[in-house]
Curated annotation (Swiss-Prot):
It is found in: Periplasm. Its EC number is 3.4.19.13, 2.3.2.2. GO terms for molecular function: glutathione hydrolase activity; leukotriene C4 gamma-glutamyl transferase activity. InterPro entries: GGT_bact, GGT_CS, GGT_lsub_C, GGT_peptidase, GGT_ssub, Ntn_hydrolases_N. The active site is at residue 376. This enzyme consists of two polypeptide chains, which are synthesized in precursor form from a single polypeptide. It catalyses: an N-terminal (5-L-glutamyl)-[peptide] + an alpha-amino acid = 5-L-glutamyl amino acid + an N-terminal L-alpha-aminoacyl-[peptide]; glutathione + H2O = L-cysteinylglycine + L-glutamate; an S-substituted glutathione + H2O = an S-substituted L-cysteinylglycine + L-glutamate. The gene is ggt. Transmembrane segments: none annotated. GO terms for cellular component: periplasmic space. L-glutamate binds at residues 100, 394, 396, 415, 418, 447-448, 468-469. This is Glutathione hydrolase proenzyme. The keyword Signal applies. Cleaved by autocatalysis into a large and a small subunit.
Length: 575
């Protein structure tokens, strides 16, 4: 009887494991011999692969994809926004391009406050006053001119064709458009005339044509940055600003320049991480968390064990305090990078973490002791020579500020919301930030975008990044930990359920199946608080050499791509 009972228990355990494995099963990563492109929109992925096939390098492909996404992924792909590009060249050189939007010269620290000093709801997220000076065109052209091999005309041509002739919408495309139907209905003369079909929401199988955007892209193709920052497009942008209550002028456009910076770098268990420096907080926070976790036996503790999750949550909590307190535009703020990236500092944080008691966010301050919108897009590319590019760029919210530079087809960002409108008041992503990120003329707002490249022995092994507002950092981090600490293959690491802690609010957001019920109970007994998932990220990742770190290649394939299934428009594609 005893043996029978044991056998039944064993069978029940086996069945539950089998059911879990069926639920959690991932497809194999996409393999290719000569190069790989992973983007959030399948047509853009194909554009990138065609550039690689024609002899272009990873930077050429990144530029072509950037322009193509402005057409086929208008919710976040853009030429009216900005972003970051991390580059690791095959010869070992690495660099970072900052084409983040800037505050207009007329911007002031209190521009979104009423007479009583309270934040005016929606002022920094909707309308022309919410728009920062766009940087995407400057960034793409800087990258192409310095690191690319193809002509501007060759790289913009696919985007022009897609805008001029249109492309057939699939379900994922219309799902994205439907998120802003009410906004388009309010702006029927401009965005509504483009992103609705004769006044009705688009349906799958219908064709989206963007003639004004095609004309703008032709001007950029012919004149480079002058096709956007001067002349017809600039005149229409400035006129739209003036008519709509915005403050961007021609002087703002004239002064915009892409910055080339040294990336943030750190080491984790034998791998070298190359990521985004300020005005991104991404690389700093990822490295700070990794430095903390490196002192714990994460592999031995096991994937999403109570102890491992507890340590990770607490590391996130402490690192986000520093993010929100210290970091800002390096032209205006002295960012204490050496201190935040110091492994001795990480050791002090570990000493402050109670192994079985959650920290209380409101009591954690920057330093020790005590501790001193999803709505973006990311793509990853590696070419046959090993050049790697990781790009995250954005309009901030879906479809940005919900306004256009009229007559240009260009949707404009609402990036001003990423500044601190008022110390202690959260932005759209719930981030509470400090004076270091205050609004000021010509300043670039702090960002969470984290385009990241991981190397070993000087060669690229991983390219990874995601959209998702403040969740970008933790989603990128967890994907890397899943491979480095837990031995997952690339697609498993991307698919795995995630959790997110950003200091404030107190609760940690968890996706379905991220924690088993008993693990969650243990963590709650230690004082951890949990809330449901936030909007999904979309990881776009590439591994070089094998489907998993330290694994064996499949056939002749050298490149392996993983597209996040959480959004249904993307594609990993190689050749």
């Amino acid at each position: 009887m005893k043996n029978q009972t044991f056998s039944k228990a064993l069978l029940a355990t086996a069945l539950s494991c089998a059911l879990f494995n069926v639920h959690a099963a991932s497809q194999a990563p996409v393999g290719a011999e000569n190069g790989m492109v992973v983007t959030a929109q399948h047509i853009a992925s194909k554009v990138g692969v065609e550039v690689l096939k024609s002899g272009g390098n990873a930077i050429d492909a990144a530029v072509a994809v950037g322009y193509a996404l402005a057409v086929v992924y208008p919710a976040a792909g853009n030429i009216g926004g900005g972003g970051f590009m991390t580059i690791q060249l095959a010869d070992g050189r690495k660099t970072f391009l900052d084409f983040r939007e800037k505050a207009p010269l007329a911007a002031t620290a209190n521009m979104y406050l009423d007479k009583d000093g309270n934040v005016i709801k929606g002022a920094s997220t909707t309308g022309y006053l919410a728009v920062g000076v766009p940087g995407t065109v400057s960034g793409m052209e800087y990258a192409r001119e310095k690191y690319g091999t193809k002509t501007r005309q060759q790289l913009i041509s696919p985007a022009i064709t897609l805008a001029d002739k249109g492309f057939v919408l699939e379900q994922g495309d219309v799902d994205m458009l439907w998120t802003s139907t009410k906004d388009f209905e309010k702006d029927r003369a401009n965005s509504g005339a483009i992103f609705m079909n004769k006044g009705q929401p688009f349906q799958p199988g219908e064709r989206l044509v963007q003639k004004d955007l095609a004309r703008t892209l032709r001007l950029i193709s012919a004149k480079g940055t002058d096709g956007f920052y001067k002349g017809e497009v600039a005149d229409k942008l400035v006129a739209s600003m003036k008519a709509g209550g915005g403050i961007i002028t021609q002087a703002d456009l004239d002064q915009y320049k892409t910055r080339e910076l040294a990336p943030v770098e750190c080491d984790y268990r034998g791998y070298h991480v190359v990521s985004a420096p300020p005005p991104s907080s991404g690389g700093v926070v990822i490295c700070e968390i990794m430095n903390i976790l490196e002192g714990y036996p994460m592999k031995e503790l096991g994937y999403h064990s109570a102890q491992g999750v507890h340590y990770t949550i607490e590391a996130m909590r402490h690192a986000y305090v520093d993010r929100n307190s210290y970091l800002g535009d390096p032209d205006f703020v002295k960012n204490p990078l050496a201190h935040l990236l110091d492994k001795d500092y990480a050791a002090k944080i570990r000493a402050a973490i109670n192994p079985q008691k959650a920290g209380i966010s409101q009591e954690i301050k920057p330093g020790v002791p005590p501790h001193e919108g999803s709505n973006t897009t990311h793509y990853s590319i590696v070419d046959k020579d090993g050049n790697a590019v990781s790009v995250t760029y954005t309009l901030n919210d879906w479809f940005g500020a919900k306004v256009m530079a009229n007559g240009t087809g260009v949707l404009l960002n609402d990036e001003m919301d990423d500044f601190t409108s008022k110390v202690g008041v959260p932005n759209m992503y719930g981030l509470i930030q400090g004076e270091a990120n205050a609004i000021g003329p010509g300043r670039r707002p702090l960002s969470s975008m984290s385009p990241t490249i991981v190397t070993k022995d000087g060669k690229t092994v991983m390219v990874v990044g995601t959209p998702g507002g403040s969740r970008i950092i933790t989603a990128t981090l967890l994907t890397m930990l899943n491979m480095i600490d837990y031995g997952m293959n690339l697609q498993e690491a991307v698919d795995a359920p995630r959790f997110h802690q950003q200091w404030m609010p107190e609760s940690t957001n968890i996706e379905a199946f991220a924690l088993s019920p008993d693990t969650q109970k243990i963590l709650e007994s230690w004082g951890q608080k949990f809330a449901g998932p936030q909007p999904a990220n979309h990881i776009a990742a590439i591994l070089v050499g094998a489907p998993s770190l330290g694994g064996k290649p499949i056939g002749k394939n050298r490149f392996y791509g993983a597209n996040d299934p959480r959004r249904n428009t993307g594609l990993a594609l190689g050749y």
